[in-house]
Curated annotation (Swiss-Prot):
Pfam family, one: K_trans_C
Recorded catalytic activity of this chain's protein: K(+)(in) + H(+)(in) = K(+)(out) + H(+)(out)
Described purpose of this protein according to its UniProt entry: Transport of potassium into the cell. Likely operates as a K(+):H(+) symporter.
Name of the gene encoding the protein in the UniProt record: kup3
Keyword field contains Heme: no
Similarity-based family: Belongs to the HAK/KUP transporter (TC 2.A.72) family.
Protein name: Probable potassium transport system protein Kup 3
Location relative to the cell: Cell inner membrane
Keyword check for Transferase: no
Record-level Gene Ontology MF annotations: potassium ion transmembrane transporter activity; symporter activity
Organism: Sinorhizobium medicae (strain WSM419) (Ensifer medicae)
GO cellular component, one term: plasma membrane
Keywords from the UniProt entry: Cell inner membrane, Cell membrane, Ion transport, Membrane, Plasmid, Potassium, Potassium transport, Symport, Transmembrane, Transmembrane helix, Transport
Spans through the membrane: 61-81, 107-127, 143-163, 173-193, 211-231, 255-275, 287-307, 345-365, 371-391, 402-422, 427-447
Domain of life: Bacteria
């Protein structure tokens, strides 16, 4: 597996590489937003009912779609937020890590904002596969109405297969994601062009006054429709989250050259079709195609939705890994499915949770029409969070005056709040789902942070300063522990205090190794730490050294590999004659200790679900010694 230098944020050094990154970004970054035409315009028309939508309403709706894509995706994400990176990496937690590193006047507010944004993204990762796959497979009802009852079972089978192959990695098939999605966008654009001629009046949708006029005249229905309009930009947050994988210029080029034109043409074509054939309101996307093309389009749409689903699943894995490394969640098992790309990971527990959530949503709602209202809340919430974090970023990182930041971001923030309000109208129609998912994840992250903090406070009362301990054991005395040959490495989170496992080893075994290394592992608030900055070794005495290993929150925290690097550069020890001492705590709940009983039990359950440090840090299992203790929390 390559080191972190091989996984720096993507940059194109020549034209072929730039084109490869651009096509790749079309598949991974834009897969989600590319499937929105399947259902977004249909859902926007739904409040008017069959035959209840007039020409002005159709043109106004398409105008709203075009200008929402322009304001939210083009201006906010493609032109602005892609520049707000943390050493080339984007995403909510990456931006939060940068703000916490730089310092902010509102650390608690920023923490909760970042965690809420991440939690909403996990909700999105459950809803996107369910909604997009259902939307694609529902096209079968137009091919053969008798297949109506088979839509849900077929969709469930596709989802089961999709999650079943996650453990094998997607490296082998991901090379096809970009080309397949490129074909999808080109077909959508061609379909749009073919139908714009049905009624050229649709071209007046480019005039933003039509969007404003629609909202002014439609009243409450217009406000409710905004929730469906926002479905056209679902997946825009992936632009920012995938910044490190493809680079800003490739993502921007893909948007302006392919994605935006294809989406605009397709929505214009759907609008023209509805103007000329009002009965097409039931499913304007698939009704753009002749009967002979319906089955191929269902197959292509299904492939596109699988790619979109894969993108958010991969994004969820990456986000949870960031949360683990930043200390927001316990250490879950992380499997690397590629020998060359640390970004290709698989988290078994997270995969199971996502699969369970997706299947539950599909079985609970049964159709894309019923599930669509649940989608907008998570996306609008995540985008509002991005804007809040971006406001603090431009002030701290770019040095913008407060008035300048307000002038630039307030219009976007206000627009997103309006969309959020429109989506909140759908809470009783399924909008509660992402709120419940986000609330559960926030509760877990907050409980973990509080529990870890309380645990540190309790153990700190028994801590022995490391310098004091070394002075004591180095002193010649008849009670001094027996020295044994070899090297012992003791893992600790607090390098200035004596590891509890070291104290227990002396207390119970009465021995001290010839060489003792106090090792601490730090996660920097940057995505990757260069190998030259990976470690620092400090000699404390003849028998004691302090080793600090540093990893970025996107790095594979492979301690064995880092130690090999240390050995090459002068840190002398034999890995197979070295013992790694780890402490294992048995947590006992006590409602009087600082946490409510329910939170105590949740924290202990989360701690018990964490992967063994031996596996997580890639330590040689046959060289690990564990000593346990009970802690009341």
């Amino acid at each position: 597996m390559a080191d972190s230098l091989d996984h720096a944020p993507a940059q194109a050094n020549n034209l072929p590489q730039f084109l490869a990154l651009t096509i790749g970004s079309i598949g991974v970054v834009y897969g989600d937003i590319g499937t929105s035409p399947l259902y977004a315009f249909r859902e926007a028309l739904r409040p008017f009912g069959p035959g209840g939508v007039g020409r002005d309403e159709v043109i106004g709706l398409v105008s709203l779609v075009l200008w929402t894509l322009t304001a939210i995706v083009t201006i906010k994400y493609v032109l602005f937020l892609l520049r707000a990176d943390n050493d080339g990496e984007g995403g909510t937690l990456s931006l939060l890590a940068l703000l916490l590193k730089k310092g902010t006047k509102y650390p608690v507010l920023m923490f909760f904002a970042g965690v809420l944004g991440a939690a909403l993204f996990i909700g999105d990762a459950m809803i996107t596969p369910a909604l997009s796959v259902l939307s694609a497979v529902e096209g079968l009802k137009l091919v053969a109405p008798a297949l109506h009852d088979y839509v849900l079972p077929i969709s469930v089978v596709i989802i089961l297969l999709l999650f079943a192959v996650q453990s094998r990695g997607t490296g082998a098939v991901s090379v096809f994601f970009g080309p397949i999605t490129l074909v999808w966008f080109l077909v959508m654009a061609a379909a749009g062009v073919a139908h714009i001629g049905d009624d050229l009046a649709i071209l007046s949708a480019f005039n933003p006054l039509n969007a404003i006029g629609f909202l002014w005249n439609a009243g409450l229905i217009g406000f409710i429709v905004l929730g469906a309009i926002f479905l056209t930009v679902t997946g825009a947050e992936a632009l920012y989250a995938d910044l490190g994988h493809f680079g800003r210029h490739s993502i921007q080029a893909a948007w302006f050259a392919v994605v935006f034109p294809a989406l605009a043409l397709n929505y214009l074509g759907q609008g023209a079709l509805v103007l000329s054939h009002p009965d097409a309101i039931s499913n304007p996307f698939f009704l753009m195609f002749p009967n002979w093309a319906l089955l191929p389009m269902v197959i292509l749409a299904t492939a596109g939705t699988i790619i979109a689903s894969q993108s958010v699943i991969t994004g969820a894995f990456s986000l949870i890994r960031q949360a683990i490394h930043l200390g927001f969640l316990p250490r879950f098992e992380i499997c690397y499915t590629s020998e060359t790309q640390t970004g290709q990971i698989y988290l078994p527990l997270v995969n199971t949770i996502l699969l369970t959530g997706v299947l539950a949503l599909m079985l609970m709602f049964g159709s894309s029409e019923a599930l669509a209202p649940a989608y907008g809340v998570s996306i609008t919430g995540a985008m509002v969070i991005d804007t809040i974090l971006a406001f603090e970023f431009v002030r701290r990182q770019w040095g913008w005056p407060a008035l300048t930041a307000i002038a630039v971001l307030l219009p976007l923030f206000s627009l997103e709040l309006i969309f959020l309000g429109a989506n909140l109208f759908k809470i009783h129609h399924g909008g509660y789902v992402p709120i419940l998912i986000a609330g559960t994840l926030i509760m877990m992250m907050w409980t973990w942070r509080k529990g870890v903090s309380l645990l540190r406070e309790k153990t700190a009362r028994q801590d022995v300063p490391l310098d004091q301990f070394i002075a004591t054991v180095e002193r010649k005395s008849e009670h001094a522990p027996v020295e044994v040959p070899g090297t012992a490495i003791f893992l600790t989170a607090t390098p200035d205090t004596t590891p509890a496992v070291l104290l227990h080893n002396i207390k119970h075994n009465h021995v001290l190794h010839q060489h003792n290394v106090i090792m601490t592992i730090k996660t920097a608030k940057v995505p990757y730490v260069p190998e030259k900055d990976r470690y620092t070794i400090t000699k404390l005495s003849d028998r004691f050294s302090l080793l600090e290993l540093r990893f970025g929150f996107m790095d594979d925290q492979n301690v064995s590999r880092a130690l090999v690097r240390c050995r090459k550069e002068g840190f002398r020890f034999e890995i197979m004659s070295t013992s790694f001492y780890l402490g294992r705590r048995k947590l006992i709940a006590d409602p009087r200790s600082g946490l409510p009983q329910w939170q105590d039990k949740l924290f202990i359950a989360m701690a018990d679900s964490a992967i063994d440090p031996t596996e997580y840090f890639h330590l040689p299992a046959n060289r690990v010694v564990e000593l346990g203790e009970q802690v009341i929390i």
